[in-house]
Amino acid sequence: MEELDYQKIGRKIRAARLEKGWSQDRLSEKCNISLSFMGHIERGTRIMSMDTFVALCNELEISADYLLWDIIRPSDPILLNILNGVKTKDAATY
């Protein structure tokens, strides 16, 4: 079984948070965790509990599949916006 890349998960959480226009402080309050811990999660330097993981997925409207295995579902509007932004930027560089 593949080992989880917590830094990659943290980057995805940060991207989804920024897509919503939220600060770390706002997301940490919504998930009932400290601002410091939120920063550690986004940097991948601390492992979150399952409760925190679920809260982040719910608040950010992203699936656990995406965070863990890069599977994007059509019901993840934030992820689709992020992906569309990446495609647009990639096309503009060529």
Predicted regions and their residues:
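Short amphipathic helical patch at the helix-1/turn junction of helix-turn-helix
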Residues: 7, 18-19, 47
